[in-house]
Structure formats: C-alpha cells, structure tokens
Design a protein with these regions (language model features):
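Long, low-complexity, charged/polar intrinsically disordered regions in eukaryotic proteins
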Residues: 93-174
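A short, conserved structural fragment
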Residues: 226-237
Length: 246
C-alpha cells in the first residue's frame, strides 16, 4: 500500500542516513529555523530533493551566524516507475528512459548562486537510483503545484531511495569549473560549450537524450558562471558572444 507524507520517503531516508553518518540530531531548532540535521559540532546539513534555491533565505541566515552548512541534493540517474490502482494494487513496473546528469541541477541554483562560493557552504550531489510510485486516476488531472502543462491519468505518490551510486562535492571555484569540459579553447561560444558537454558525456557512455538535455543547459551554465565571477564575456565571433574562464 502506498503511503503519503508531507515529508517524502526519499527526503526522510537521506535525513536519517546523514544523521547516523555524522552523529547528528534531526529536526533541530536553530534560531527561527528548523534544520534537518545538526551535527555534534554544530554544523547544519539540509536535505533538498527539489529546488535548491528555496533554501536561500535559510542558508544565508545560517551562514551569517557562522554555521557550516552542507546542502545534500539527490540527482536521479536511474528511476523505476511503479503505477498503482487507487486500492493499492500494483498494475505496472518499468524503468524510466530519463537519466539526469550533473547539469540537471543548474536550474535549481539560479536563486542561491550568490552563496555557492561561501567558504562555509558545501553542495553535496548524490547520484541515486530511486523507485517512483504513482497512483492511477479515472480521468486526466493536473497537479496542485501547476507543474504539468497537460493533464495526465496518474498522480505522484512517493519516491523511495534504492541506492547511492556516488557523491560529488561542490565548494570551491575549481569544483564548479570542473563542469566546463577541459577540451574547450580558452575563448569559446555557447555552441562550442554545447558541443563539448555533449562529447564529454558521450565519452562517459551517457545516452543520447541525456547528452542533448545536458548540452541544452550550456546557456544557463554561463549565466550562472558569469554571475559567480568564474567566466566573463570577451568579445564576439560573428553573431555569437565569446566567453573565457577567469
């Protein structure tokens, strides 16, 4: 039977895993905030399974108070979809063709980018496999959060963690600059960056659709990096703007 909580199973599982790993306590009041985890050293760990930028006010406040903050963000590289009838009977189970790459997190950073290079902030990205549970509906429906452009005959119920494949930490300029493939020339255009990202992921045996989706984030990557003072505009090449790393 599917269970529904305000806190997702994925969030809850990661919270308890990190609390055990860091000998921390969960749901701890810190000033006006309730923090997912506070370690025995007073460091804060926040689990964010959706838009990282939603944590901006909380993160800024904690950093201003001198806290070390780690944001843990799961990135789904493999998803199994289970669909259930309203009575809880399982009717289908399949693998989703969609696989996220590291570039999928960029959009969720657009509001928090001023804090990303703060010395006391670490972004820890988990590459995970999950099972997503859905409930069949009698008629097509939209979601309350308005995230659907078109009605569908199912609603999401739960996301369950299956495994953590690996972790990547982003804290320094060098960490973030690793998102720019080393094959790029010193001065480059957005099409150059798109091609380099696509080629790099192909070498890593990423499927074509995921490579294309990642390459399409090149413009957003440069939007972020120019504001983080990692990249600057340096001229024109035809109609294309030239960029270079700083």
């Amino acid at each position: 039977m599917i269970q529904t909580y305000n806190e997702s199973d994925l969030h809850r599982t990661l919270k308890h895993l990190y609390a055990l790993e860091h000998n921390g306590k969960t749901e701890v009041p810190v000033g006006k905030w309730i923090c997912d985890i506070v370690t025995e050293n007073g460091d804060v760990i926040e689990i964010q399974t959706a838009n990282i930028s939603k944590l901006t006010p909380k993160t800024k406040s904690l950093l201003d108070d001198g806290r070390n903050v780690t944001i843990v963000y799961p990135l789904v590289i493999e998803k199994t979809i289970e669909t259930y009838m309203p009575d809880g009977a399982l009717i289908s189970r399949r693998k989703s063709p969609k696989k996220q790459t590291i570039y999928a997190m960029l959009r969720s950073l657009t509001g928090i980018y001023p804090l990303l290079l703060h010395g006391n902030l670490t972004l820890e990205v988990l590459f995970v496999t999950i099972t997503e549970q859905r409930r069949k509906t009698a008629t097509p429906v939209r979601l309350a959060n308005k995230s659907r452009h078109f009605p569908k005959t199912w609603v999401p119920q739960e996301k369950k963690l299956e495994s953590i494949i690996r972790k990547e930490r982003y804290k320094t300029k060098a960490d973030y600059m690793a998102l720019i493939p080393p094959t790029l020339p010193h001065e480059f255009t957005i099409p150059n960056l798109q091609k380099a990202i696509f080629s790099k992921l192909q070498e890593d045996k990423t499927n074509k659709n995921s490579c294309t989706a990642a390459a399409n984030q090149a413009r957003l990557l440069l939007w972020l990096f120019t504001r983080m003072d990692l990249v600057e505009k340096c001229g024109k090449q035809g109609r294309c703007t030239l960029y270079r790393t700083k």
